[in-house]
Amino acid sequence: MKLNLVGLGRNTPIYILEKFDFDEQEFFSSLKVKTTEVAVLKTCHRREIYYIGDKEPLTINEIIEPYIIRKSGIDVVRHLFKVSCGLDSMVLGEHQILSQVKNTHKNFCHGKILNKLFNEAVSLGKEARTKTGINKYPLSISYIAVKLIEEQINIEGKKIFVIGTGMMGQKVIKYLVSRGADIYISNRTIKKAYEIKKMFSEVNIVDFEEKYKHISSSDVVISATNAPHYVVEEKKVNSQKNIIFIDLSMPRNIEPSIKEYHTLYTLEDLNEISKKYNKLRQEKISTIQNLIETRIKKFLTWYKLQTVKDDILYIQNLAEKLVYEEIEKLSKKILLDDNSLKQIQKSLKSCTKKIVSYHINYIKEKVI
């Protein structure tokens, strides 16, 4: 029952992460047939496969091999717990990663041990945030994107065009509405755009095919879609003024060459602003680390007991079998009334239980 992790961490360059992009459900289904237990955690900044076994359930492309992280045993547990608590995020303590770990546990986790591990990770993530208040301030990537805009221009009254109405896009819109921006939104599925309109009446809906017309007249353009290709191409942007482009997508949705004529920020650029806000949360780290170490001990105790669970069950069943056999032999050799037989049976079971219990506790102590 060897616990392992293989994947790409948050420090992996975007162009490498793009080479290891996949549909979670299809990828998860393909791995399930290759190993007894597996879990897939995919976010904007990481691609991680947790599994039980000695052999990696996938072939690593030589291009991404230099960036691969591999962990085993307690290091896997500590890594996931740090991830769920937001200690391994671009934004220290950010809440979105906890939702992503929870999603993995619910939809992309297979096997008793990994289910237990991810359940503990989700529980710990909630405990860490509740006890320390590390997420008191909204420091998600979407929030940092808006703060980045505020450092460049006064948002109030400015035309800001948001492409994509998923979770990230919705958060951006929420922050922009509170700052009085003139917001335009577009989504390939127009129905979803109207759903956002119900949530934020201030927004204006743009047909996806008309997006370039509005891009050219915008002060800021934010892309937050799940498209596997460029949604904004440099040659189609017709504007003499400097437009601030922010690409919150993975893979990237805004053609990189656009920065030759305009201002472009990607997920990597947000790291600089995140450092400023991380200082507000640094004091909480030691408390969370203590919570992590306590939870690691709890999980490892459970994990180690699983290795001897079958042995313990065997001993208990064998003891019951031997007691039954001895009572059967005794009842045939000695004529006893029912009451006497019950008393002997009770005493024999009690004695056996104490002996078995002693040995089981000894085994547990040795393992733990």
Curated annotation (Swiss-Prot):
| Keyword ATP-binding carried by entry | no
Q: Where does NADP(+) bind?
A: G164, T165, G166, M167, M168, G169
Q: Where is this site: Important for activity?
A: H79
Q: In which pathway does it act?
A: Porphyrin-containing compound metabolism; protoporphyrin-IX biosynthesis; 5-aminolevulinate from L-glutamyl-tRNA(Glu): step 1/2
Superkingdom is Bacteria
Choose any GO biological process term that the UniProt entry carries and state it.
protoporphyrinogen IX biosynthetic process from glutamate
What residues sit in the active site? C44
The enzyme class is oxidoreductase
Keywords from UniProt, A to Z, are: NADP, Oxidoreductase, Porphyrin biosynthesis
Write down the CDD domains for this protein, in alphabetical order. NAD_bind_Glutamyl_tRNA_reduct (cd05213)
Residues binding substrate: T43, C44, H45, R46, S89, E94, H95, Q96, Q100
Q: Name one Pfam family in it.
A: Shikimate_DH
One GO term in the molecular function aspect is: glutamyl-tRNA reductase activity
Q: Which transformation does this protein catalyse, written as a reaction?
A: (S)-4-amino-5-oxopentanoate + tRNA(Glu) + NADP(+) = L-glutamyl-tRNA(Glu) + NADPH + H(+)
Its EC number(s): 1.2.1.70
- Oxidoreductase as UniProt keyword: yes
Q: What is known of its domains?
A: Possesses an unusual extended V-shaped dimeric structure with each monomer consisting of three distinct domains arranged along a curved 'spinal' alpha-helix. The N-terminal catalytic domain specifically recognizes the glutamate moiety of the substrate. The second domain is the NADPH-binding domain, and the third C-terminal domain is responsible for dimerization.
What is known about what this protein does? Answer: Catalyzes the NADPH-dependent reduction of glutamyl-tRNA(Glu) to glutamate 1-semialdehyde (GSA).
UniProt similarity note: Belongs to the glutamyl-tRNA reductase family.
Listed under subunit, the entry gives: Homodimer.
Q: What else is known?
A: During catalysis, the active site Cys acts as a nucleophile attacking the alpha-carbonyl group of tRNA-bound glutamate with the formation of a thioester intermediate between enzyme and glutamate, and the concomitant release of tRNA(Glu). The thioester intermediate is finally reduced by direct hydride transfer from NADPH, to form the product GSA.
Q: What's the protein here called?
A: Glutamyl-tRNA reductase
> Species lineage, top-down?
Bacteria, Thermotogati, Thermotogota, Thermotogae, Thermotogales
In the UniProt record, the gene name given for this protein reads: hemA
